[in-house]
């Protein structure tokens, strides 16, 4: 039988001390609370800039938007060092994703807070077959190549306008982002930069809306 080498006592104490140090550095959540939630069912747009509502499939949602930006101001947050933003959005009709042809794309959607753009991506509602597929970047930032509807939570909804009579032309996504933040107020904004030069009615061709938005304040044990 092969014996293991004898470890010196000082070495054991060094390893044990290192493990204790690492263990004490683990960041844990001390408090997490929802400070803002809106699914627009109560028609409340308090704190919104460019807020507007419409009813779609018997549900009240914010929108619909084209090349527009919308924001919500959330004030008097409790003590925190992180904020988690969760936005459920709907991508309507003929979004073309990544193609950069100056006629139909790229079709950008972005999310930010205060004066910082946090996330910029593209979405595509294109069919995807061996001979034709317009790729998107989501769930990654632009530029990445992913199949249309990658990361979606619902894909079989009908379009809103130009493809309103056809299934699979509205796609629902839940976008989640965690940011370091400690100020008592936060302004969250989202918007789109869409290109559709060959359409007489661009907003009917491509639009987006917001089904819900949630903001959570998180306090960890970080000093």
What does each model-identified segment do?
Residues 101-118, 212-214:
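Short edge-strand/loop segments of extracellular domains
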Residues 2-13:
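Bacterial N-terminal signal peptides that target proteins for export
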């Amino acid at each position: 039988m092969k014996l293991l080498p004898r470890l010196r006592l000082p070495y054991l104490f060094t390893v044990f001390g290192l493990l204790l140090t690492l263990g004490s550095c683990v960041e844990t959540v001390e408090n997490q609370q929802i400070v803002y939630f809106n699914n627009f069912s109560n028609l409340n747009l308090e704190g919104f800039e460019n807020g507007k509502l419409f009813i779609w499939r018997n549900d009240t949602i914010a929108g619909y938007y084209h090349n527009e930006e919308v924001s919500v101001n959330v004030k008097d947050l409790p003590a925190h060092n992180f904020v988690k933003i969760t936005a459920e959005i709907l991508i309507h009709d003929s979004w073309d994703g990544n193609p950069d042809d100056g006629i139909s794309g790229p079709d950008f959607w972005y999310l930010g807070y205060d004066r910082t753009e946090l996330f910029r991506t593209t979405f595509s509602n294109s069919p995807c077959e061996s001979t034709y597929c317009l790729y998107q970047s989501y769930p990654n930032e632009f530029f990445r190549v992913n199949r249309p509807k990658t990361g979606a939570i619902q894909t079989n909804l009908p379009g809103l306008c130009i493809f309103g009579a056809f299934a699979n032309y509205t796609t629902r996504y839940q976008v989640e982002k965690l940011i370091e933040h400690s100020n008592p107020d936060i302004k969250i904004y989202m918007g789109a930069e869409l290109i559709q030069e060959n359409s007489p009615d661009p907003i009917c061709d491509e639009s987006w809306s917001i089904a819900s938005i949630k903001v959570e304040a998180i306090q960890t044990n970080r000093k």
